[in-house]
Structures are given as structure tokens and as C-alpha cells.
């Protein structure tokens, strides 16, 4: 017999009855029923009920056991007594009568229980992550993550892609976030950087004659805490292809992502034939570039119905050309209580309020706005929005660039409050035609809005003749249920166009050469047209596991202060290590 086990804790069935077996695992739960001890023994594969009564030679040893002790149990498989089967367990028809117990690893008092799914403070869970990972839901999420990554790999290879690994130590480059820097011992005063993404390397692969690259790539960004991204590192399905158009990339990747979602959707519907939504349309209809299409609400510009109207607040605003009035339909929201609740919510978001119109039976509009603009305009708004009696509409006004984010939040709030969001689907879409540049209010300059290596629509001519803020790029995102899960673009593969694109964003040619020397040189020796994308593995897994917390699908995540509480990182290092790296610390005054 094997030293530790003949079977796993998830293996025993009716066919094993009367066999002598050996199991090893953790004491998940111990129950005393009238002097009979029931030990639920757990391992990675499942759970088996083991029984020790006073007649068992191992009864005295069983009495000493405590939760999460690691033990070896020998015993005989038998049928559970009639009426005590557990249909929720694969092993639920049988139990093991214990004849011998060996304690392999006793456990101290637990800082958090493994049995059950009760909530515990996050710092405790992260500090004792090895215990947290034993809990059923989190353990299953990690296994699902592995299966999803396997599915991605399989589907990418079926599409003709090849998996390569790119370097982890590289050069620092301006890709939108701070780099994690690694000092060089051999080259004093110089630093490597951990890659924010394999962007330059995957483009260099295309210039090296490879095609259809992918990898599950770790990425590192020294960013301030964000709710939708873990501090430190994350993983992406990184992709690049040569001699392709935007449509070619869509045709290659849509089946991969759709297939992964269908495989792990657990009965939810998955969009087939994804819609393509222009960035400008997405912002106008949904108030965001990552729309949740499970929500059927589409906002509309209804400025004409308020221009010159009796509602002077909006009418005066509309005298300025940049201002608009947008309507947010609220099907079924035509009650005073709901409209007042939305108005209070808007005030809680720092807004002056949220104007509204309700439609009564017979189509009559009600509310302060309806009273001020009159029945004809009210009816025209109702018809434009496709609303009926019992519905409402909410209004935001001003400069769309300033209110669009709030309008998107209001659309989401209305959809949630009126139960309009279809929770039984994964609604996938492409968002296309992103602006190449945006105006950075902090730095008072034009900056890249997305990936700086993307091809502008119109090429070099657009860069030299158009207002930079009107240039669109061959950039695209994949969105799902309100999350951006992938981003990509066709690359700017001509060196003169690359230099011009960076020049508009404030980078001189020499700075481009210094920062992107390897890629700049490669462009001089025959660069193919190429493009690609990167899909966020963590976010996809999060969606498919049905959680909204990235820590629930990650093995050993940091907390929001970028600390690994389990390993004690970041940590101080010895003076000797600092001397070897030629580093002297200049710490801020913490007094």
C-alpha cells in the first residue's frame, strides 16, 4: 500500500465498497454524534466522510483531531446507512470506517476558518492566504483560472498562432504608467524595467519574420490603486500578427474569446457576431467606452426639444454651441417616488440634481420640466425616445465632455434600479475608432489617448494636416458587461510616421530613438504591416467566475497598498546589498 494514499478524497464510489483504502488530507470538519465521530477528510480532489465509533481501534486517536490537521486514515469502505446519503458529494453514497490514523501535520489555532464561506477582513485573508486558498470557492476559482488559460492556449493554437516568451528584464519606456525599476549591479547607475507589456518585443517578433505570436504574459505597472486592477502585476493574452488589417484580427480573435466564454459560461448566453461600436457613438449612447450592453438603455441628444423652450435653465445653456441636453430613458420608471430617488442619488454624486419627465396614462407628461416646456415638446421627446405611459426620462445638460461620465453612471443606475439588466448573458462588443490623441489637462499638452504605437487612420497625411484631436486611430477594445477585457491596434510600422506621431505628443526624434532604439532600428530594415491586441486574463476569469473582486481569482495578490502581507514585500534590504548595487537611499521625512 502507498505510504500516503491509495485513493484521493474525491474518488470513492459504490464500486469501492468492502475495499481497504488509505486516504490523506485535511480534517475539514469533525462532528460528534452521540459518541460517534464523523471526520470529513478533504484534499484537492474532494471530500470523504470517515467514521470512528468507540469500537474502532483508532477512536482514541480520532478524539484528538482538530480542524485542518493533516492526517492519514486507513479504513474500510462501506455503504452509508439508509437515508444519510449526500447527493451534493460525488462520494456521498459511501463512508470509510476508520481503523488507523496517523497525524502527518498538526495545525495550530486557525486565524480564519476554512470550513464555510463567511467573510473575513481582507488583510487577514491575505496574510494567511495559504488557509484562504483551502476554502472551496476560492480554490475552485483558481482551478477555473487554470482551465480558462488552457482553453485560451488551445484555441490560439487552433487558429494557427505560435507561443513565444519575451524577456522580463527590459528597458524603461513611456507606455502610460510608472515602471518597476531593477538596478543593475554590473552597470552602476543604470536600471532595467519590468515590462508594462511585451509591446515592443512582440512588434520586433513580426519584424524578425515570425507570424501569429501569442503568450500568456505577465505585465508590471507601478500604478496607484485601482478598483479594476490588482497592484503590481497582471496577466494578459498577448497577440500580434503580420500582414493583417483590423478585420483580419477581428476574424482571428473573436472565435477565440467567444469560445472561451461559451466553454465557461455556465448556461449564460454569449454574444455571437459581436457588434462594432464607434468610440464616439459609445460615449454618446452609453456614456462610456466600455458599455454594458446587457442594459438596453440608449441615451439620446434631445437638445432641439429644449432650445428656446420655457425651461430657461436648459434654454440658456443651449445658447452656447458646445452645450447639449441628453435624455436617459427609464422604461417603467414613471413614478414620483422613483424619480425623486434618482434625483437624490444624483445629488449624492455631487450633481445639482437630475431633471425628469414622467408620462401618465393617456401620454400626458408630468413633472417640473414637462410643465415648463409644454405638451408639444413633451410629446416630441416621448416619441423620440420610444416611451409610453408609465415610463420616465431623465436629463443631463451642459458640456458633454464634462457630464458624459456622470450620464453613463446615471444610465447604469436607472438600468439597475428598474431591473433592466439581463444578468444571464455575456454581452461582448468591439469598440473601434478611438481618438489617437487627447488633451492632458494636468500637463496642458496633447498626449496619446491609448497605445502610442498605433497607426493613425489616414497615415502620415493625417499626422501632418489634421488637428491632432480629430485624428482617429486603428485602435479597438473588446468590452463585456461593462468591462474592457482587451485592447489592441494596427501598428505604426513606418519610422517617419512613428517619429511624427511621438512629436505631436511632445517627444523629440532623439528621445524616440533613445527610448525605442531597438524597434526604431528594426523599422529601418523592412517592417511588415502588423497589428495585435492583448486580452486581460484576470478580468476574463473574474467575469467567468461570477465575482467582481480580482483578488478572488488570483493566487497571492497584493493589497490595495501594493503590499504582499504573506511574504512581507516590499521589504528593506541589507546595506551590503545596497552597496553592491551602488545605491544610496534618500528617504522622505516621515515625521
UniProtKB/Swiss-Prot annotation:
E.C. number(s) listed in UniProt: 6.1.1.23
InterPro entries (alphabetical): Aa-tRNA-synt_II, aa-tRNA-synth_II, aa-tRNA-synth_II/BPL/LPL, Asp-tRNA-ligase_1, Asp-tRNA-ligase_1_N, Asp/Asn-tRNA-synth_IIb, AspRS_core, GAD-like_sf
Main location: cytoplasm
Location in or out of the cell: Cytoplasm
Coiled-coil annotated residue ranges, if any: none
Binding site residues for L-aspartate: 175, 221, 450, 491
Residues bound to ATP: 221-223, 484, 536-539
GO cellular component, one term: cytoplasm
Keyword flag Ligase: yes
Segments passing through the bilayer: none
Broad class of enzyme this protein falls into: ligase
Origin superkingdom: Bacteria
Keyword ATP-binding annotated: yes
Site (Important for tRNA non-discrimination) residue list: 33, 83
Region (Aspartate): 199-202
Family: Belongs to the class-II aminoacyl-tRNA synthetase family. Type 1 subfamily.
Database matches in HAMAP family: Asp_tRNA_synth_type1
Subunit structure: Homodimer.
Function: Aspartyl-tRNA synthetase with relaxed tRNA specificity since it is able to aspartylate not only its cognate tRNA(Asp) but also tRNA(Asn). Reaction proceeds in two steps: L-aspartate is first activated by ATP to form Asp-AMP and then transferred to the acceptor end of tRNA(Asp/Asn).
Protein name: Aspartate--tRNA(Asp/Asn) ligase
Underlying gene: aspS
Amino acid at each position: 500500500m502507498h505510504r500516503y494514499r491509495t485513493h484521493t478524497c474525491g474518488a470513492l464510489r459504490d464500486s469501492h465498497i468492502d475495499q481497504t483504502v488509505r486516504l490523506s488530507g485535511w480534517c475539514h470538519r469533525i462532528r460528534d454524534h452521540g459518541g460517534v465521530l464523523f471526520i470529513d477528510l478533504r484534499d484537492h480532489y474532494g471530500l470523504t466522510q470517515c467514521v470512528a465509533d468507540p469500537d474502532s481501534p483508532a477512536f482514541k486517536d480520532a478524539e484528538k483531531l482538530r480542524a485542518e490537521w493533516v492526517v492519514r486514515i486507513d479504513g474500510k469502505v462501506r455503504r452509508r446507512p439508509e437515508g444519510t446519503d449526500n447527493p451534493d458529494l460525488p462520494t456521498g453514497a459511501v463512508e470509510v470506517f476508520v481503523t488507523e490514523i496517523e497525524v502527518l501535520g498538526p495545525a495550530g489555532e486557525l486565524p480564519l476558518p476554512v470550513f464555510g464561506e463567511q467573510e473575513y477582513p481582507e488583510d487577514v485573508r491575505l496574510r494567511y492566504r495559504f488557509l484562504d486558498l483551502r476554502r472551496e470557492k476560492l480554490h475552485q476559482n483558481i482551478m477555473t483560472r487554470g482551465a480558462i488559460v488552457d482553453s485560451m492556449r488551445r484555441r490560439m493554437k487552433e487558429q494557427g498562432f505560435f507561443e513565444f516568451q519575451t524577456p522580463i528584464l527590459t528597458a524603461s519606456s513611456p507606455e502610460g504608467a510608472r515602471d518597476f525599476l531593477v538596478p543593475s549591479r554590473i552597470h552602476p547607475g543604470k536600471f532595467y524595467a519590468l515590462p508594462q507589456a511585451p509591446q515592443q518585443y512582440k512588434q520586433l517578433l513580426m519584424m524578425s519574420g515570425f507570424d501569429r505570436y501569442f503568450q500568456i504574459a505577465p505585465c508590471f505597472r507601478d500604478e496607484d490603486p485601482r478598483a479594476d486592477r490588482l497592484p503590481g502585476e497582471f496577466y494578459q493574452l498577448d497577440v500580434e500578427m503580420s500582414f493583417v488589417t483590423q478585420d483580419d484580427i477581428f476574424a482571428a480573435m473573436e472565435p477565440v474569446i467567444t469560445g472561451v466564454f461559451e466553454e465557461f459560461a455556465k448556461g449564460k448566453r454569449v454574444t455571437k457576431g459581436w457588434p462594432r461600436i464607434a468610440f464616439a457613438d459609445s460615449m454618446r449612447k452609453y456614456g462610456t467606452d466600455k458599455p454594458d450592453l446587457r442594459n438596453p438603455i440608449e441615451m439620446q441628444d434631445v437638445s432641439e426639444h429644449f432650445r428656446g423652450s420655457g425651461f430657461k435653465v436648459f434654454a440658456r445653456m443651449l445658447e452656447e454651441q458646445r452645450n447639449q441636453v441628453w435624455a436617459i430613458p427609464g422604461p417603467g420608471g414613471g413614478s414620483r417616488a422613483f424619480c425623486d430617488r434618482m434625483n437624490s442619488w444624483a445629488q449624492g454624486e455631487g450633481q445639482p440634481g437630475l431633471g425628469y419627465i414622467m408620462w401618465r396614462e393617456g401620454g400626458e407628461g408630468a413633472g417640473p420640466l414637462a410643465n415648463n416646456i409644454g405638451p408639444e415638446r413633451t410629446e416630441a421627446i416621448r416619441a423620440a425616445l420610444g416611451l409610453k405611459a408609465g415610463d420616465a426620462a431623465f436629463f443631463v445638460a451642459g458640456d458633454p465632455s464634462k457630464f458624459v461620465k456622470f450620464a453613463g453612471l446615471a444610465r447604469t443606475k436607472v438600468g439597475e434600479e428598474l431591473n433592466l439588466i439581463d444578468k444571464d448573458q455575456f454581452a461582448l462588443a468591439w469598440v473601434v475608432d478611438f481618438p489617437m490623441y487627447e488633451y492632458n489637462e494636468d500637463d496642458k499638452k496633447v498626449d496619446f489617448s491609448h497605445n502610442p504605437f498605433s497607426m493613425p487612420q489616414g497615415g502620415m497625411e493625417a499626422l501632418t494636416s489634421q488637428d491632432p484631436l480629430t485624428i482617429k486611430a486603428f485602435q479597438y477594445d473588446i468590452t463585456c458587461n461593462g468591462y474592457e477585457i482587451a485592447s489592441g491596434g494596427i501598428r505604426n510600422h513606418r519610422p517617419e510616421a512613428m517619429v511624427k506621431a511621438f512629436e505631436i505628443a511632445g517627444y523629440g526624434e532623439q528621445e524616440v530613438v533613445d527610448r525605442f532604439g531597438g524597434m526604431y532600428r528594426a523599422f529601418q530594415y523592412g517592417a511588415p504591416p502588423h497589428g495585435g491586441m492583448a486580452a486581460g486574463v484576470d478580468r476574463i476569469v473574474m467575469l467567468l467566475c461570477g465575482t467582481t473582486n480580482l483578488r478572488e481569482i488570483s493566487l497571492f495578490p497584493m493589497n490595495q497598498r501594493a503590499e504582499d502581507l504573506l511574504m512581507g514585500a516590499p521589504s528593506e534590504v541589507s546595506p551590503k546589498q545596497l552597496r553592491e548595487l551602488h545605491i544610496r537611499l534618500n528617504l522622505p521625512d516621515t515625521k
